Amino acid sequence: MNSVVPEDYVGYTEVTREAYDPEKAKELLAEAGYPDGFEVTFDAPNDRYMNDEQIAQAVAGYLEKVGIKVNLNLMPKANFFSYIKPLENKSMFLMTGWSDASGDGLSLMHDMLYTYDREAGNGGVNRGHYSNAQVDALIDQAFTEMDDTKRGELVAEADKIAREDYAYIPLHFEQDTYAIKDTLNYTPRMNKYVYAWEFSYK
């Protein structure tokens, strides 16, 4: 996973994932004024996503290797989502997931990366309080673009800027397993929805 926009969604673009380079990370920390690292609280659920506790522990381990002390704050989903729901409550660092049934990356961009504005209904799950006027402008423009290809280009550009800002760190897409009778044709959907009319006999 290199982006929040899944393959086959409008706005998906192939992105080269950055190589794991702890020495470079240490250099960047030193350049930023943290030669000895710093301390961070990492909020994550432990029963919502597939292997979420193990993933959070792995992320914490990678951060520890470059000198960032991680206080891992794991909690059940019943507590986690109420804990992070008020966007005024600024988690330092958190792990969450998001999905979208539209097949269009624009919805993901608007919900996750648009500057949060409760009254306007923008950035509803922008839990990192990311704000970039250029990203907002591209998303606004994409909402008025009816051509899928052109809209996809706007979404991809907004995502590129957000990734370069490190607005988020993509980890993975959950993989689903389906058991299907060998007399049927079916291609699973990215949004995990299952519709009977999408099955056909061979």
Residue ranges and their predicted role:
Residues 1-61, 65, 129-134, 138, ...:
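Append "and occasionally in soluble cytosolic enzymes with long acidic Gly/Pro-rich linkers
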Residues 2, 32-49, 91-97, 102, ...:
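Bilobed periplasmic-binding protein-like "clamshell/Venus-flytrap" ligand-binding domains
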Residues 10-24, 34, 85-89, 110-140, ...:
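Short, solvent-exposed loop/beta-turn-alpha elements that line the ligand-binding surface or hinge
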Residues 25, 80, 151:
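Acidic, amphipathic alpha-helical patches
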Residues 28-35, 62-69, 83-87, 112-115, ...:
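Structured segments of extracytoplasmic/periplasmic soluble domains
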Residues 42, 62-117, 154:
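Periplasmic binding protein-like
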Residues 54, 60, 64-73, 185-187, ...:
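C-terminal amphipathic alpha-helical "assembly" element
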